[in-house]
A protein has these predicted regions:
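Arg/Lys-rich, positively charged N-terminal/basic patches that mediate binding to nucleic acids
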Residues: 1-45, 51-53, 140-190
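Enriched for short, Lys/Arg-rich terminal
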Residues: 217, 222-235
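Conserved positions in beta-strands of structured domains
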Residues: 13, 105-108
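Short, conserved beta-turn/loop elements at beta-strand boundaries and strand-helix junctions
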Residues: 17, 109-116, 225
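Short coil-to-beta-strand transition motifs
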Residues: 2-8, 95-105, 214
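Active-site-adjacent substructure of cysteine-protease-like catalytic cores
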Residues: 49-101, 191-193, 200-204
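Flexible glycine-rich active-site/ligand-binding loops centered on an Asp-His dyad
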Residues: 119-153
């Protein structure tokens, strides 16, 4: 068996501070903005010359938070309710022989200053600290295939849950808007995807959850109408 060695070229800075509630695919949370910081010796302006002319990028990265669990020949995709098993190569599961992922993100800006190269990204679906091993520009003529079929994932999942905020949290969000633009929209879009494990959907009203987004512990409860955010705790 041939082994290959790759070097990390950069690291992701993201509002997702833990893997819980990270969208299962890119593009589902449009307000999720973050950055890719290139590291030495790849943090050279010449290495990204011309990249600003592309609107979207493929980010190849390592599933660093799940790689110790090893790979599995079959997995249970959330889109199938978490009960049906599929071959790992027929899914985008993190439990792969080589823990490599790919994400299609929006490129908002390329910032180069001295020995710093930062790519500002949109529609991000990567956890903070994710190691990046490659960047490739997205080519619409070659990679957009409207006639392609995709089995159980032919279309994007519907944003399932209505999300509301208590009056106290709404006031808190207003005071944070200047420092955290689109924070309200970001929380709403993340929770609307219903990040709960498939087997826990349909639980009794009143069940509470929490997730670390930006610099806050966001706490919400299940209600008859959807999700209600009742606490925003600084971390």
């Amino acid at each position: 068996m041939t082994c290959f060695q790759f070097e990390q070229i950069g690291v992701i800075r993201s509002p997702y501070k833990e893997k819980f509630a990270v969208p299962r695919q890119p593009g589902l949370v449009k307000s999720a903005n973050g950055e890719l910081h290139l590291i030495a010796p790849y943090n050279q302006a010449d290495a990204v010359r011309g990249l600003e002319a592309f609107s979207h990028l493929w980010i190849l990265f390592v599933f660093h938070q799940t790689m110790e669990g090893g790979w599995r020949p079959t997995v249970r995709p959330p889109r199938l309710g978490g009960n049906t098993r599929m071959g790992v190569f027929a899914t985008r599961s993190t439990f792969r022989p080589n823990p490599i992922g790919m994400s299609l993100v929006e490129l908002k800006e390329v910032v180069c200053h001295k020995d710093s190269v930062i790519l500002k990204l949109g529609s991000l679906d990567l956890v903070d600290g994710t190691p990046v091993v490659d960047i490739k520009p997205y080519l619409p003529f070659a990679e957009s295939l409207p006639d392609a079929s995709a089995s159980y994932a032919q279309s994007a999942p519907a944003a399932e849950m209505a999300v509301s905020f208590t009056a106290e949290v709404e006031k808190q969000l207003l005071t944070l808007e200047k420092r955290y633009p689109q924070l309200t929209l970001f929380i709403r879009e993340v929770l609307a995807q219903d990040p709960r494990p498939a087997y826990r959907k349909g639980e009794e009203t009143g069940k509470t959850y929490a997730v670390w987004l930006h610099d806050f512990n966001v706490r919400w409860r299940v209600t008859d109408a959807g999700f209600e955010v009742f606490a925003l705790e600084p971390r």
